[in-house]
Amino acid sequence: MALSLAISPCPNDTFVFDALVHGRVPGAPPVEVTYADVDVTNTAAERGAFDLVKVSYAALPWLLEDYHLLPCGGALGRGCGPLVLTRGDRTDLSGATVAVPGERTTAYLLFRLWAADQAPARIEVVPFHEIMPGVAAGRYDAGLVIHEARFTYPRHGLTALVDLGEWWEGDSGLPIPLGAILARRGAVDPVEATAWIRESVRQAWADPEASREYVLAHAQEMEPDVVDRHIGLYVNEFTADLGEAGFAAVEALLGRAADAGLVPQTSSSRATAWTS
């Protein structure tokens, strides 16, 4: 029986999951894939819609009752945080209309922690690919962006008001937890799922060209050099194993957010994960 998998079409996800999706991981079952923005997968996971699913770490407090957090396959690192973009030389967001990619995304959670002493007039949830054009056209005063936008935003005539990754790393000393891989309880063994994903990651690193056509086919018109930079930044040591620093980052982010009343209190992410 095929497992249902939901990931984004972003190059880091398709690179990581190429071998698993295409049946090259020994012992793994067939996989049926859905590609969607993380705001969509966050919502779908609340309904238990997928066996394996990529979600925002910010959504974990609402999901861990039904899902295991896997210690691999996700997006966590340094120098890869969300950016707040504007058209001009704005120095704060007081009274601004800000476009964000989702209310339960890690990007928006980091934004709320950073902007605690500011008061944007309005927050609008906007599909990720519409944020930069919308800010450039003046529909929004600022936009919160992730992933490949850090490489391409100057083309839209935009400037970075703040790099939330730099802010988080400087404030906490920890890497930035962005996207997690979850396994639905009762549907898939988390130990087996972890082994499959780690083997898929191993194959991706061993032969990057094997996934090239698949990655580019889903890369939303990204140039090959941007795709390569994207993969190089977001697929890293934490993709293979969250490790001590990775789990510490997740626990620090969710703990700080819970203390601020932004997410429900939850047990340690380590206690709800399968780890080797």
Give, region by region, the residue ranges found by the protein language model.
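Hydrophobic/proline-rich hinge and linker segments of small-molecule sensing/allosteric domains
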Residues: L69-R90, W168-R185
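Hydrophobic residues within well-ordered alpha-helices
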Residues: A44-E46, V135-A136, A257
